[in-house]
């Protein structure tokens, strides 16, 4: 877009229309004309938790990657566990009420760093651009630094978290490499390692809130999105549903179910259930609960995700029973607090 040149810059009357604005200063009107998503972190305020409500402390076993709230994964390195707590309705020093995520090291004395991350999906247009990360935090861990990993390597910015267990606001920059590929993971670590590289002490913790990644070299106010907007952004990577979709029996023990995703997923997802089994899955109207497995198969998109629309695909459900080929049905998960899982996360 060409820059707009005006004779009276920075003066836009409250009743201005687009024609009037065309005579204004470009830097003033550009944010209005080009408004869009600012925060490339998804669920930076921890409202979306499709896997369950983790308001109670969750024990994360050693060397085990766990996602509690959407898009945030933690993995304790070393021989001990860490505790993840999802705190709701906290109040920050500026008076804003929000949620926070807290990671606390257990009795582990050989864990050299925190590994709580969000992987932001990269795109080519990010090449050579500068992004700013900002968030609120509190910690008791001395000499703690954050970290990021781009498509080339991992780096610790020259900033340190204040270990006084009070809330502080911090921002730091990510200068992207000159050639950023599509679909790679840009890892954001709000806290990572002590400057000395010493192991974490037992009881060391990091708690953080309102995480933002935005284009440019200045941290601006947090971008608030509606719950529905945030959920749809999270759906690109992970979805849970109690109704999978309708379809037809392709054979006596094989049901083809057509899945229509609310948004295009990052790639063809892996299907599973919350329980890990299939005994709570029913194909109406049979009420047999005899599903033995499921996978994304016949007729589904398998191409490059930067040109393919992974929003419609076929799931084949196998059964131990028999039904007439050509009959229709609806695949549902309707007992024991179970649900379908579609996973296409980074």
Model regions and ranges:
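Extracellular "spike/adhesin" assembly and maturation modules
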Residues: 1-19
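Extracellular and organelle-lumenal recognition/adhesion modules and their flexible linkers in secreted
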Residues: 3-4, 20-346
């Amino acid at each position: 877009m060409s820059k707009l040149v005006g004779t009276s810059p920075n003066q836009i009357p409250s009743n201005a229309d687009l024609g009037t604005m065309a005579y204004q200063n470009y830097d003033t009107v550009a944010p209005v004309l080009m408004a869009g998503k600012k925060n490339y972190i998804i669920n930076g305020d921890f409202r979306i938790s499709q896997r369950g409500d983790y308001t109670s402390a969750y024990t994360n076993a050693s060397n085990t990657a766990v996602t509690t709230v959407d898009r945030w994964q933690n993995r304790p390195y070393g021989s001990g566990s860490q505790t993840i707590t999802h705190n709701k309705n906290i109040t920050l020093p500026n008076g804003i009420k929000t949620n926070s995520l807290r990671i606390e090291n257990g009795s582990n004395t050989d864990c050299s760093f925190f590994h709580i991350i969000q992987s932001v999906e990269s795109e080519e247009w990010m090449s050579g651009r500068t992004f700013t990360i900002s968030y609120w935090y509190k910690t008791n861990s001395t000499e703690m630094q954050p970290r990021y990993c781009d498509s080339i390597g991992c780096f610790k910015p020259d900033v340190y978290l204040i270990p006084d267990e009070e809330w502080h606001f911090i921002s730091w920059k990510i200068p992207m490499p000159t050639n950023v590929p599509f679909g790679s993971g840009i890892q954001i670590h709000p806290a990572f390692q002590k400057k000395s590289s010493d192991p974490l002490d037992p009881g060391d913790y990091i708690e953080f809130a309102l995480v933002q990644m935005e284009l440019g070299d200045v941290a601006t106010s947090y971008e608030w999105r509606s719950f529905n907007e945030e959920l749809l952004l999270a759906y690109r990577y992970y979805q849970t549903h109690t109704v999978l979709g309708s379809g037809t029996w392709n054979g006596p023990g094989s049901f083809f179910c057509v899945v229509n995703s609310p948004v295009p997923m990052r790639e063809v997802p892996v299907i599973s259930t919350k329980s890990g089994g299939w005994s709570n899955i029913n194909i109406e109207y049979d009420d047999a609960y005899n599903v033995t497995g499921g996978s994304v198969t016949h007729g589904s998109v398998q191409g490059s995700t930067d040109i393919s629309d992974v929003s419609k695909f076929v799931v084949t459900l196998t059964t131990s029973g028999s039904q007439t080929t050509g009959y229709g049905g609806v695949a549902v998960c309707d007992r024991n607090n179970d649900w379908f899982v579609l996973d296409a996360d980074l």
